[in-house]
Amino acid sequence: MDLNLQDKVVIVTGGASGIGGAISMRLAEERAIPVVFARHAPDGAFLDALAQRQPRATYLPVELQDDAQCRDAVAQTIATFGRLDGLVNNAGVNDGIGLDAGRDAFVASLERNLIHYYAMAHYCVPHLKATRGAIVNISSKTAVTGQGNTSGYCASKGAQLALTREWAVALREHGVRVNAVIPAEVMTPLYRNWIATFEDPEAKLAEIAAKVPLGRRFTTPDEIADTAVFLLSPRASHTTGEWLFVDGGYTHLDRALV
C-alpha cells in the first residue's frame, strides 16, 4: 500500500535509535523526508542506511530540554524544506524516579519525558496547520497500568495521552490530526540496558515474553513504526484523538489466556 507520503517532511524526536529510529527508517522507505532530532549524533551505519532510502533525510543535534534549541531546530527545518507535514514526539526514558526521589527529581523527569512534547507541538503547529499535517505521540502502557517506582515517567506518559485528546480537539478545525501509539514490551537499546540490570537477564526476558498473549514475544520497533507512519499518512485521514495499543494484547487481554 502506498501511504502517499512522498516528500512529506516529518520531524522525529529521538529518531536515531530504537522506536524512533525505526519510525525514521520507515518514513524514508515511504519516500517521506525524516528530520531526526536527537541529542547525540546517530550511528554512522544508521545514517548511511537512512540516506540510501531517502537522500534528503536530515539529522539535527537538539537538546530537547532546551526550549530555544527546539524552536531553532524547527525553524531550521522550515528554512531547509519550506514545509512541515508531521511531528513524532518520541524521545524519553523510563528513568525510575519514584516516590522516594523527591520533588526536584520528579520535575526533572517531567522535563526529560513530557515538557518537550508540548514545546515541539507549540513550535510545529503553525506549520502543521499550513499543510493540514499530523502529530503522533509515542506513549507507554505504563500510562494506564502503572509500573512501580517510576512516578515521573508514568505521569509523563499519562499526560501525553491527555494531550493527544486535547490537541485533537484544539486542532480539529485546522485539519491537523493527533493520535498516540502505546507500546508495552519493545526490545530497544534502552530496554536492553534495563534488562541487563537483572541477575539473569535471559530468564527475565523469557518471563516477560511469556506474558504477551499474541505470539509470546516482544513487539518489534518496526511494528510500532508501521502504526505510527500509517497514522501520519493520508490513509488515516479520518482518525484523530485515538490511543492505539500496539502490544500483542499485553495490556488488555485476560492474562488467564496466557
Swiss-Prot record:
GO biological process, one term: fucose catabolic process
Tagged with keyword Oxidoreductase: yes
UniProt keyword terms in alphabetical order: Carbohydrate metabolism, Fucose metabolism, NADP, Nucleotide-binding, Oxidoreductase
Group of enzyme by EC: oxidoreductase
EC number, as in UniProt: 1.1.1.435
Residues of the active site: Y153
The UniProt record lists the keyword Oxidoreductase: yes
Coiled-coil region: none
Molecular function terms from GO: 3-oxoacyl-[acyl-carrier-protein] reductase (NADPH) activity; nucleotide binding
NCBIfam families on file: PRK08628.1 (NF006384)
Leftover remarks: L-fucono-1,5-lactone is unstable and is rapidly converted nonenzymatically to L-fucono-1,4-lactone.
Physiological role: L-fucose dehydrogenase involved in an L-fucose degradation pathway. Catalyzes the oxidation of L-fucose to L-fucono-1,5-lactone. Can also act on D-arabinose, with lower catalytic efficiency, and has weak activity with L-galactose and 4-deoxy-L-fucose. Shows a preference for NADP(+) over NAD(+).
Protein name: L-fucose dehydrogenase
Organism per entry: Burkholderia multivorans (strain ATCC 17616 / 249)
Organismal lineage: Bacteria, Pseudomonadati, Pseudomonadota, Betaproteobacteria, Burkholderiales
